[in-house]
Amino acid sequence: MATNSPSLWIDALPATFADSNKYTRGHAVVFGGFPQTGAARMAARAAARMGAGLTTIAVSTEALPVYAAALESVMVKSISATNDFEQLIADQRVSAFLIGPGAGVLGSTRSRVLQLLSTGKPTVLDADALTV
């Protein structure tokens, strides 16, 4: 059994260069739920900490103040309308998605999961996204 250490995974991380910018380092989008915000906030922090050049948490308008107050280094974007979601997932600068924490076991969550998976971009399914 191997012990977790940087030697096991360091080669999997992309190289960084002096001319790197936030988009060349990757743009992670976390879809956060409400009122359960903890897991999505932790996921966004983890993405930023592991080296994503830009991390955005996408939430409903009512949840915006909660996330904005808690996440200083993460952008917060409202996706209340269907076209907001569709525009965000179509953005070519976005590298990867995470959906599920606090999303709710809803038809809309299932629809969004299917739309995200159809993009072909790396997508992490967690919590409610695994249930729908």
Residue ranges and their predicted role:
Residues 1-127, 131-132:
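Small-residue (G/A/S/T)-rich helix-start motifs and N-terminal tracts that mark the onset
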